[in-house]
Swiss-Prot record:
One of its GO terms (biological process) is translation. One of its GO terms (molecular function) is structural constituent of ribosome. The gene is RPS17A. Keywords: Ribonucleoprotein, Ribosomal protein. Belongs to the eukaryotic ribosomal protein eS17 family. Transmembrane segments: none annotated. PROSITE patterns: RIBOSOMAL_S17E (PS00712). HAMAP family: Ribosomal_eS17. It holds the Pfam family Ribosomal_S17e. The keyword Ribonucleoprotein applies. This is Small ribosomal subunit protein eS17z. GO terms for cellular component: cytosolic small ribosomal subunit; mitochondrion; nucleolus.
Length: 141
């Protein structure tokens, strides 16, 4: 069973990663040396804990965005995803096939002249649903 990390370790790791992300690596010993240079940490034990959690977070960042850490690269990627507009809509409304009853309802609402609506036979629109068991013979017990 793992150990519980204190709030101090988590907060300081996140701050160090946000400020010095370009210098941090996936190696514990390298991160420990970087922490020694950039931060004033009162004890060796605390420094090791922060370096260990920083290494853990760096590995998680490699897989995807991590909650609580705001990196420039992740911000830009998120904005690109939000601004993306597909070339072709996933919902195609060129032709909408409806049955006779639905056409009558649209006519009563005054929307019968809407473009792209075509009538379809109910038998043609509804495909037969296969019976449970795939249509094979019943079991013999």
């Amino acid at each position: 069973m793992g150990r519980v990390r204190t709030k101090t370790v988590k907060k300081s790791s996140r701050q160090v990663i946000e400020k010095y992300y370009s210098r941090m690596t996936l190696d514990f010993h390298t991160n420990k040396k970087i922490l020694e240079e950039v931060a004033i940490i009162p004890s060796k034990r605390l420094r090791n804990k922060i370096a260990g959690f920083s290494t853990h977070l760096m590995k998680r960042i490699q897989k995807g965005p991590v909650r609580g850490i705001s990196l420039k690269l992740q911000e830009e990627e998120r904005e690109r995803r939000m601004d993306f507009v597909p070339d072709e809509s996933a919902i195609k409304t060129d032709e909408i096939k409806v049955d006779k009853e639905t056409l009558e309802m649209l006519a009563s609402l005054g929307m019968s002249d809407t473009l792209g609506i075509s009538a379809v036979d109910p038998q043609q629109a509804m495909a037969p649903i296969p019976a449970f068991g795939g249509g094979r013979a019943p079991r013999r017990y």
